[in-house]
């Protein structure tokens, strides 16, 4: 089983696993540490996500009602790409999430909003470390079994922070008049004064559509879903399409890549600097193309699902 989110999302299954000694792979090394602490009976290993490749695409048939033909995908030349910058992912309005908190009693509301404000101020801290600190501040010493249940019960905090920063990054670019093509649902619900610069496709999209959008872009923007020692597949998918990956960082990414060599990092803490960074990148397409090509070489050699499958097989035959 590959846990594609923090283990707190899977507490009920992990506490009573459906298969004895179920083997678990986590996509973030902090998630691995969390598993070893709170679910020590389950074998767990680190397995970073990989990128998705477009192998073929359908060319529409000139005859109405007929299926198109499958053709091998060809890389779109960097200078001829349709989009300057794309983001692939849905948006959940944070106001909707806050309403759930507002339904709680006054004491709980204060507790939850203190956590949210602390996470906004310290986005480098993992969700479980932040939640544990606030739980212990409120309740003192708590046994690990009770602590893991309490953390799992606050999954909405993680969802809130993902949505908050996703919205803030897109809004930051739009309000500086930098057009961003977003592929995903609900972006019209983002509280932003510059919606003309958020070009929406208006619906949920599948992985193939996401990869195709990234393949036709010069820059693929990533906002990490609170992975502090792992990565999201958007990073490697961009690299495999010869597209520059622009992402907030993590310890794992810093260990494996160099800023402005195979990708470009920005800071959530200093997101006000992002618009100027994007403008400078778009002014230097040749440099962007060089970074994208180095990213491709790295990803195709080490970060495809074929290589991840080989790693799993090697682990299973140990």
Segments the model singles out, each with a brief description of its role:
Residues 1-6, 23-26, 49:
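Active-site proximal beta-strand in glycosyltransferases
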Residues 4, 49, 90, 267-268:
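Active-site donor-binding loop signature of nucleotide-sugar glycosyltransferases
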Residues 12-25:
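A conserved, positively charged/aromatic
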Residues 17-19, 34-40, 61, 78, ...:
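Catalytic binding pocket for nucleotide-activated donors in carbohydrate/polymer assembly enzymes
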Residues 24-42:
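A short, active-site helix/loop in glycosyltransferases that binds the activated sugar's phosphate group
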Residues 38-60, 77-228, 250-253:
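Nucleotide-sugar donor-binding catalytic core of glycosyltransferases
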Residues 71-73:
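Cationic, low-complexity basic patches in intrinsically disordered or flexible, solvent-exposed regions
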């Amino acid at each position: 089983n590959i846990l594609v989110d923090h283990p707190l999302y899977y507490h009920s299954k992990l506490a009573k696993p459906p298969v004895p000694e179920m083997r678990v792979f986590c996509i973030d090394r902090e998630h691995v540490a969390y598993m070893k602490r709170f679910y020590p009976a389950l074998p767990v290993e680190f397995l970073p996500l990989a990128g998705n490749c477009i192998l073929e695409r359908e060319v529409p048939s000139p005859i109405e009602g007929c299926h198109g033909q499958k053709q091998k995908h060809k890389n779109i030349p960097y200078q001829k790409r349709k989009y300057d910058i794309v983001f692939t992912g849905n948006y959940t309005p944070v106001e909707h999430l806050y309403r759930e908190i507002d339904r709680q009693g006054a004491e709980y509301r204060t507790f939850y909003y203190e956590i949210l404000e602390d996470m906004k101020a310290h986005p480098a801290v993992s969700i479980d470390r932040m939640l544990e600190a606030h739980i212990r501040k409120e309740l003192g010493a708590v046994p690990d079994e009770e602590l893991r249940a309490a953390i799992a019960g606050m999954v909405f905090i993680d969802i809130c922070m993902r949505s908050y920063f996703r919205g803030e990054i897109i809004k930051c670019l739009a309000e500086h008049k930098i057009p961003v093509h977003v592929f995903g649902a609900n972006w019209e619900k983002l509280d932003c004064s510059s919606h003309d610069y958020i070009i929406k496709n208006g619906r949920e999209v599948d992985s193939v559509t996401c990869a195709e959008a990234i393949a036709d872009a010069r820059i693929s923007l990533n906002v990490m879903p609170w992975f502090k020692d792992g990565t999201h597949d958007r990073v490697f998918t961009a690299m495999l399409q010869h597209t520059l990956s622009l992402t907030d960082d993590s310890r794992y990414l810093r260990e494996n890549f160099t800023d402005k060599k195979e990708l470009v990092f920005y800071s959530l803490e200093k997101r006000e600097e992002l618009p100027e960074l994007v403008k400078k990148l778009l002014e230097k397409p040749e440099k962007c193309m060089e970074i994208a090509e180095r990213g491709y070489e790295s990803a195709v050699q080490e970060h495809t699902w074929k290589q991840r499958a080989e790693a799993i097989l090697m682990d299973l035959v140990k």
